[in-house]
């Protein structure tokens, strides 16, 4: 017992030393860090600033991006996709971030190895790595606190733009001077290149998908034409929902994990409140997915299964639903445009209530919300 007590003293001292080495404005600190036994993981405020800076740079460049920021355990801390981004843009952003995290080096390093020796690409993929530029470790005072991945835009390195350059400039603005980027190697010439004609598949100029909803609610214009869909929740509406829910949770003394997805189950916006752990984050995602798949709030099944537990095996095992409250399909003027899932308790105020506050802030009385019958005395 004496040695066990000594070990806890050493661990506590080590945590304090880390806390002193890392500026508190960049990492989870104080009692929240002690609660999760980690003084070295990027906080939500820093992740959001990096993402929003990169998004601003992309807007200035006239391009759209998707961005993922992971903590040093590989959990999603902040994710956002700009309007018009498709599935591949979004998933490759995460793959780049995860590659930078696992290798503790820029994902371009893996890409350069493949350029120099194409035979290593299969091994890289087998290891779960994505050998492409756009992922960078986030390092403060020689301590890795997370990783960032950016995808979705065509590189124009000679003109000073690429996904990687966007991430690098954003981190420089938020964190201070960053190490120089690795050399951009010229792509290896493809031997025996074929001459097969490649078809085009795009809408005629000026033709865009139509929606009865206002443009601030859904993807519109050229962005909608890129994905052939005018009824997907817009990036700005998703941000407004999440920020309102985040503030509501803070007012109730806690934090939340939030996922907002479109009707194709593609991530639009995500954030992990400081102190939230894997189970909070993952359940938020499962709630959003279940709400989308069932087109019902997850609280409906949660109540039904409490009333009749015999349905649990089918709901959980055969259908794969997650039946805790906190997931709501996003239905505006009768049109489903996405789904939200909230996990982590929202400071005791309730995950579903947090989601409801966010939805009301974004869509007012045009959004469909769960209504509970009055209890009889």
Region locations from a protein language model:
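Sec/Tat signal peptide C-region and signal peptidase I cleavage site
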Residues: 15-19
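Positively charged n-region of N-terminal signal peptides that target proteins for export
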Residues: 1-5
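Flexible, solvent-exposed loop/hinge segments and secondary-structure transition points
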Residues: 20-377
């Amino acid at each position: 017992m004496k040695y066990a007590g000594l070990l806890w003293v050493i661990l506590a001292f080590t945590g304090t030393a880390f806390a002193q080495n890392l500026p508190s404005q960049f990492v989870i600190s104080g009692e929240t860090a002690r609660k999760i036994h980690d003084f070295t993981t990027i906080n939500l405020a820093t992740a959001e600033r990096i993402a929003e800076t990169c998004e601003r740079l992309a807007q200035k460049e006239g391009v759209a991006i998707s961005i993922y920021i992971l903590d040093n355990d590989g959990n999603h801390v902040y994710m956002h996709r700009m309007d018009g981004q498709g599935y591949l843009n979004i998933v490759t952003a995460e793959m780049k971030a995860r590659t930078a995290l696992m290798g503790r080096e820029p994902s371009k390093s893996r890409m350069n190895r493949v350029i120099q020796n194409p035979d290593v690409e299969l091994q890289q993929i087998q290891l779960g790595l994505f050998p492409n530029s756009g992922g960078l470790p986030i390092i403060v005072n020689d301590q890795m606190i997370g990783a960032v991945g950016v995808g979705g835009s065509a590189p124009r390195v000679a003109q000073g733009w690429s996904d990687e350059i966007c991430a690098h400039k954003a981190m420089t603005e938020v964190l201070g001077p960053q190490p120089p980027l690795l050399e951009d190697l010229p792509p290896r010439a493809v031997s025996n290149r074929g001459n097969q004609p490649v078809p085009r598949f795009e809408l005629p100029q000026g033709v865009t998908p139509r929606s009865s909803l206002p443009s601030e609610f859904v993807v519109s214009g050229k962005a909608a034409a890129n994905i052939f869909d005018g009824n997907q929740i817009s990036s700005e509406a998703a941000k407004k929902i999440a920020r309102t829910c985040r503030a509501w949770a803070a007012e109730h003394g806690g934090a939340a994990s939030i996922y907002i997805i479109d009707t194709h189950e593609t991530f639009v916006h995500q954030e992990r409140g400081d102190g939230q752990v894997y189970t909070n984050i993952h359940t938020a995602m499962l709630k959003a997915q279940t709400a989308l798949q069932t087109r019902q709030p997850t609280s409906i099944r949660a109540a039904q299964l409490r009333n009749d537990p015999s349905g649990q095996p089918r709901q959980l095992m055969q259908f794969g639903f997650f039946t805790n409250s906190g997931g709501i399909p996003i239905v505006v003027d009768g049109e489903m445009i996405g789904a939200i899932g909230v996990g982590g308790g929202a400071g005791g105020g309730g995950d579903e209530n947090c989601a409801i506050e966010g939805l009301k802030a974004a869509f007012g009385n045009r959004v469909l919300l769960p209504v509970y019958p009055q209890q009889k005395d």
